[in-house]
Amino acid sequence: MYMKLWKRNLIVCWFGMFVTGVGMSQIAPIMPLYIKQLGISDTSSISKLSGIAFGITYIISAIFSPIWGNAADRFGRKPMLLRASLGMAAAIVLMGFAPNVYVLIALRLLQGAITGYSTACTTLIATQTDKENAGYALGTLSTASIAGSLLGPTIGGLIEDAFGLRPVFFITGALLLVAFITTLIFVEEVFVREDKKPLNAREVWHMVPEKDLTIVLSVTFFIITLALYTIEPIITVYVTQLSKSTNHIALISGLAFSASGLANIIAAPNLGKLSDKIGAHKVILIALAAAGLIYIPQAFVKSPWQLMGLRFMLGITLGGLNPTINTMVKKITPNSITGRIFGFTISAGYLGVFGGSVLGGQVAAKFGINYVFFVTSALLLLNCLWVYFRVYRKFNLN
C-alpha cells in the first residue's frame, strides 16, 4: 500500500524527535544517583552538579538551534537530521562510559551543541507538506519533542529500575541510532539549493514580513515551555507532601510530571486540525486562557491523583499551542528562511525548559510550593492578554 511522502516523513521525524526529547531529559531522575556513583558524595555538590549537567544541554541547544536552522536552509534538512541523530547517539553512549562528573558535563554540553534534529524536522515537514495538511502534520510533529522531554524522566527511571544506571545511556543511544537509520532509509526531501551568498541574521530579519507577530509567537513558545517545567524541581517534594505513604514516590512523581506529555500526544493533532478550520489565532487564545486557569487548582489538590488529573488537562490545553504556533510561523515566513525562524522559536523553547526549572525552584524556595502554580498561571494569563491585543484582534480584523 502506497503511503504519501509527507506522511512517511512525518512518521520517521516524529519517532526521531521523540527519541531526541527523551535523550535530552531521561537523565533527570538518575542524574544525582549517577553523579554519586562517579565519586561525588557531598549532597549539596550533587544537587549543584545535577542542575548544571541537566540545564547546560538546553542552554547550549538554544544557542546552536538557529545555527543548525541556517545550515538546514543552505544544505538541506535531511543531512541535518542524519548529523544530529548520529552525533547525539554517540554522545549519549559515551556518557555511559564517563569516568568522572566533569566528563559527563562536557558530554552533556556536546549533546546540546550537536542537537538540531527538532529544527530540521520542523522545517522539513513545514516545507514538504501541502497547505491542506500542514496544520495536522505540524500539530502531530509538535507532540514528539514535548512528549519525549516530559516522558523522558519516567522512561529513564524505568530503565534504571530494570537494568541499572549506565544502561540508560546505552539504550537511549541505541534508539537514536535507530532514528538515524530510519531517517537515512525512509526520509525523502525535494531540496533545491539556492546559489546565493548566505544571509546574515540582520538580512534574515529584514526578510521576515511580520516581525511583530514573529516576536509574539517566539515569546509565547518560551512561556508555554516555561509553564510546563516550573513544576520540574518541586514535583517530588509536592507529591511527598500529598502522599500518605512514601512508597513509589519517584514513580508517582514521574507519572504526575509526564501526564501532560501524554495528553499532549492525544490532543495536539486534533487541535492542529481545528486551527486549520477555525483559525490558529482563535485556538492559541483559548488554549492560553484555559492553561492559565488550570494551573490555579493545582495549588489546592489533596492527593497526587488529583494533581495528575489536572496535569493531564493542562497537557490537552497546551497541546493546542505548539502546533498552532508552528502553523502560524510557517504561514508568515518565506520558505527560504523557514529553517532559521524555526531555529529561533525552538531556541525559545529550550530556554523555557531551563527558565522554568530555575523559576520553579526559586519561587518554591522563597514563597512556598503553592506560589509556583500562582506565578505560572499569572504568566500564562498575561501572555494570553498580549496575544489577544497583538495577534487575535489583528487576524480577526483581517
Which role does the model predict for each range below?
Residues 30-47, 234-251:
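Short amphipathic helix-loop junctions that connect adjacent transmembrane helices
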Residues 107-145, 327-328:
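Cytoplasmic helix-loop-helix junction between adjacent transmembrane helices
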Residues 91, 102-110, 294, 305-313:
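Paired small-residue
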Residues 79-94, 173, 282-297, 377:
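Structural signature of the two symmetry-related core transmembrane helices
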